[in-house]
From Swiss-Prot:
InterPro entries: Chitin_Synth_Reg (IPR051726), Sel1-like (IPR006597), TPR-like_helical_dom_sf (IPR011990)
PANTHER family: ACTIVATOR OF C KINASE PROTEIN 1, PROTEIN SKT5-RELATED
Keywords on record: Phosphoprotein, Repeat
Transmembrane portions of the chain: none
Spans annotated as Disordered: 1-53, 264-356, 374-406, 905-932
One GO cellular component term noted in the UniProt record for this chain: nucleus
Protein name, as recorded: Chitin synthase regulatory factor 3
Residue positions, PTM Phosphoserine: S393
Length: 932
């Protein structure tokens, strides 16, 4: 019996599939019955492979030990399969063809097998599984993302993964069109491909590296600040870009909106020319305003606008003090000028900007981002004064108070002369100071206190760019001292607080909750950050980010004191030092100076900070002057001329601001073949900065700089040809060629060229050129990842409405709208208003207050659509109590700019008012008749 069982097991494991000479297929013959385990037949045979559904031809029999062939297929079933060309028996239910069923008796094996080793015939089972019929109720349920995929092949979630593959053309089973959707379907795939991300890794576990962003809120969103840099490289060189006029640079459909923002007038000569704001860096813009606003942190210091910001006081004048028939725009905190006033850079009126000035040699950085976890509520201190016994606090402050009211806050002076001595080193930004402890003050020579934003807590997000926030007034961006949670009640119930919600019905508890969600710096950023497992449980409103949505803004170059000394030592060891080597060493000193001013924590103490600042500045200027104004035996280095011209343009590092002197230095460097100097000479000739305007020379030098591969010059000359500016004939084909050439670098300096080229491709009727949706989306995406606000807003629109081959994905749309809103881009702010108005399930809840605040923020920038949206929300009572009179004023503003919906709404209101007045007398007469 033991031999019998062992032989039986051996028999069941071995399988041999081969065909006989007469064409009949047999299966399951034991291997030891075949003499020599070889096949004597030379005719082709049919073999069954475990990886193939159908039999294939082969000239040699194959001996296989197949794991999936544990159940045999008897000879009768094999004959049927052969006669029907592989059709399974289930498909032959209604077949009328008579099939011969040859019978193979087991007596043929009895003579050759021992009686005890005859195997027991198992029950026949099919080799494959036939899927069950789909459920009739959900037969047509197919994922939309699956339908738009070509190379992505995925089984329908209705049925388990079938073992039948329908990608072969010779499949005998006939399946109707409706059933094909429940099997493996291959559908064209759009470009770009949208990843169906579910937040899990390959093995189905939650991804610990998943990135989130905080919901974009008006009063807590961060603002993109400019990092001061003495070397104007890295990104688009927008030198004197704000002196351009709209008619000279912008396309007819107003595509380059950033060029129309004129920042201010030139500073007056005399002592005031040496007076600049006391920022962490001494650099300033070529268009630096004489008076600057306190920045978005002061304007949005946790205050929700009250109803009075939106309502009108009488029939002709609204809360902004503007008559309904005026052209000027409303504003909350700044007096905005009209676009006609902003176009003239030589206007004598004082321009108060709503956003920080743009620096032609700067890099964008982000303010520290808050943690989505609830943190202690901040006070509204604008200066962080240490709580000590001495009374050195400014007027209006009480050191013993933990929560001074807003009414007692002192105002900052915005125009004070810079002290001649080196300013003290600010408090360490990256030290170990706890955010709950007060930051020691830093007293300047004027007795004022400059604060540094404290380090975020442990659960705070990781910064997108390691940088220091820069303010544009006498003090650095202020920090807010946290207070215990129990003081929230006193804040919310204080009678003198100026914080008010848009809706008058919002309770104090809701206000306290809003305050508690703010960071201790009041600059919470929806920037990307990583959240750990513990923070994930506490973060309920965080929005998951798509892995493909990220920015590629280059990090600022950091040169430490050790790097500078190492470079100096390396230069001293050289046998011969050239003028170019000395200029490169001067640039190292400038980078070290910039790093130390933006990161004062790198200095160990105050004395080291002052010494290094002096050394870096002195050595850099000496080396540059030596090679810019050399003796007769030396050659002038163009780079030194260019950098000193840059300093004269800005008035930094001890150089007096002199635009004429700067133009002379740019011209000398341009004659020496310096590429960027040629571009700046052309800009000066076009705008008349430091020289008399000359359009003919301007175009010639633009072409010369473009031939030197200056991307900015390519972009300018392309706009000139596209619009026929500066006396040139309109040549669209040549302009498009220059734009395409400018886009080849695909770097930060090409952001405007890529955006403009994509906009031109979207207007084939006007320009006669077009491109595929994939190409247009690629240009927008490359421009957006380098931080261009207009392109970021366009991506948000694409992901909102499913444009340019994209899938409609709310989280990606909100992400890119937020990136553009951080740069005060009006269209993006209106887009966020729309998302808050409608909400997105599981991503962003509805919030009427935020919708109104974002729309109002965009309306204050003069956006007609946003003005209509504010009027609509105020008329319907969304986010604020209904106020038809104020809504009417907003409709008038939008209608004056030609917005059709606003005009239509005003006509409807006029018609309804006429009908009301016409019906009123008749009703009165009827009442009189009834009485009589």
């Amino acid at each position: 019996m033991k031999d019998s069982h062992s032989s039986r097991r051996k028999y069941e494991k071995e399988k041999l599939v081969f065909a006989t000479n007469n064409g009949k297929r047999t299966e399951g013959t034991p291997a030891f019955l075949k003499s020599g385990n070889t096949a004597s037949s030379s005719s082709p045979t049919l073999q069954f492979r475990p990886t193939s559904r159908y039999p294939t031809l082969s000239h040699e029999p194959v001996y296989t030990n197949v794991l999936d062939l544990s159940s045999r297929i008897d000879a009768n079933r094999a004959s049927i399969m052969s006669a029907t060309m592989g059709t399974p028996p289930s498909a032959l239910k209604f077949s009328k063809k008579k099939i011969s069923r040859p019978v193979v008796s087991e007596d043929t094996f009895k003579d050759k097998l021992p009686r005890a080793t005859i195997p027991v015939k198992p029950e026949p089972q099919p080799q494959y599984k036939i899927p069950a019929a789909p459920a009739p109720t959900s037969k047509r349920v197919v994922n939309r993302g699956l339908k738009l995929n070509t190379n992505l092949r995925q089984a329908s979630p209705i049925l388990p993964s079938p073992s039948l593959k329908l990608d072969r053309q010779d499949a005998p089973i006939q399946i109707n069109h409706e059933q094909k959707e429940d099997f493996l379907v291959s559908i064209p795939r759009p470009t770009p491909m949208t990843n169906l991300d579910d937040g899990k890794d390959e093995i189905g576990q939650p991804d610990p590296h998943r990135k989130y962003m905080a919901p974009p809120r008006v009063n807590s969103i961060s603002r993109v600040q400019r990092r001061m840099s003495y070397i104007p490289y890295g990104g688009f060189d927008d030198f004197l870009d704000n002196y351009y006029k709209d008619d000279d640079t912008v396309l007819e459909d107003n595509q380059l909106k950033s060029n129309s923002r004129i920042e201010t007038l030139e500073e007056e000569d005399g002592a005031e020319s040496d007076s600049i704001t006391n920022t962490v860096s001494n650099a300033s813009s070529d268009a630096e305003p004489a008076h600057r606003h306190l920045g978005p942190v002061y304007e949005n210091s946790g205050h929700l606008p009250s109803k009075s910001h939106f309502s009108s006081t009488d029939s002709n004048t609204d809360s902004f003090g503007l008559e309904s028939d005026e052209r000027s725009l409303p504003s909350v905190s700044n007096d905005l000028k009209s676009s006609e006033t902003l176009k003239n850079p030589r206007n004598d009126d004082l321009l108060t900007l709503q956003q920080p000035p743009r620096y032609p040699h700067s890099q964008m950085v982000m303010l520290p981002a808050r943690s989505p976890v609830e943190v202690p509520a901040p006070t509204f201190d604008r200066r962080n004064v240490s709580r000590n016994s001495n009374n050195n606090s400014p007027e209006g402050y009480d050191n013993n108070r933990t929560n001074p009211t807003v009414n007692n806050l002192p105002s900052y002076p915005t125009n004070l002369a810079r002290p001649k001595a080196i300013k003290p080193m600010p408090t360490s930004i990256h030290g170990q100071t706890s955010p709950l402890s007060p930051i020691p003050p830093v007293h300047t020579t004027h007795g004022l206190v400059s604060d540094i934003r404290p380090l975020p807590s442990v659960s705070s997000p990781i910064m997108r760019a390691d940088s220091t926030p820069i303010s544009h007034n006498l003090a650095v961006t202020p920090s807010f001292s946290p207070i215990p949670q129990q003081s929230n009640k006193s804040i919310g119930n204080h009678k003198n607080t100026s914080v008010a919600n848009v809706s008058s019905k919002v309770a104090n508890s809701k206000f306290e909750r809003n305050i508690s969600m703010m960071s201790n710096s009041n600059a919470s950023s929806p920037a990307i950050f990583e959240v750990g497992a513990e923070a994930k449980e506490k973060t309920k409103d965080a929005i998951p980010c798509h892995p493909d949505d990220k920015l590629m803004i280059p990090s600022p170059k950091i040169v430490t004191h050790g790097d500078a000394m190492q470079e100096e030592q390396r230069l001293r060891q050289k046998s011969q030092i050239t003028p170019d080597d000395e200029v490169e060493l001067a640039k190292v000193y400038l980078n070290a100076l910039e790093t130390l001013e933006n990161k004062p924590s790198l200095a160990p103490d105050q004395a080291s900070y002052n010494t290094r600042i002096n050394v870096y500045r002195t050595r850099a200027v000496e080396l540059l002057k030596k090679n810019a104004y050399p003796s007769k035996t030396q050659n002038t280095v163009p780079e030194a001329l260019f950098l000193i011209g840059q300093f004269h343009s800005q008035g930094v590092l001890g150089f007096r601001r002199d635009l004429g002197k700067a133009f002379e230095l740019y011209s000398l460097a341009a004659k020496k073949g310096h590429p960027l100097s040629n571009y700046r000479v052309a800009v000066c000739l076009q705008t008349g900065t430091g020289v008399k305007p000359d359009t003919s020379k301007c175009v010639a030098i633009y072409k010369k700089a473009a031939e030197m591969d200056v991307v900015e010059a390519m972009f300018r000359i392309a706009l000139i040809y596209l619009n026929g500016l500066l006396g040139q004939k309109r040549n669209i084909s040549l302009g498009v060629q220059w734009l395409e050439r400018a886009c080849k670098s695909k770097g930060p300096e090409s952001v405007r060229a890529m955006y403009e080229l994509a906009k031109i491709y979207e207007q084939p009727d006007r320009y006669g050129v077009s491109a595929t949706p994939e190409r247009k989306f690629e240009l927008y995406k490359q421009s957006a990842v380098y931080g261009y606000a207009a392109a970021q807003c366009k991506l948000g629109e694409c992901y909102e409405h499913g444009l340019l081959g994209c899938l409609a994905e709310p989280r990606r749309s909100i992400f890119w709208y937020t990136r553009a809103a951080e740069q005060d881009y009006g269209e993006a702010e209106l887009g966020l208003s729309g998302w808050y108005l409608t909400g997105s399930e599981g991503i962003l809840p509805k919030n009427g207050e935020e919708a109104l605040l974002w729309a109002h923020k965009a309306a204050c920038k003069g956006l007609a659509k946003a003005q209509y949206a504010v009027g609509f929300m105020m008329e319907q009572g969304i986010g604020v109590a209904a106020d038809p009179s104020s809504a009417h004023n907003w409709y008038i503003r939008a209608a004056k700019q030609g917005f059709p919906k606003a005009k239509k709404r005003l006509e409807e209101q006029a018609l309804s008012s006429k009908q009301t007045h016409s019906k009123a007398p008749k009703k009165k007469q009827q009442e009189q008749c009834v009485v009589m």
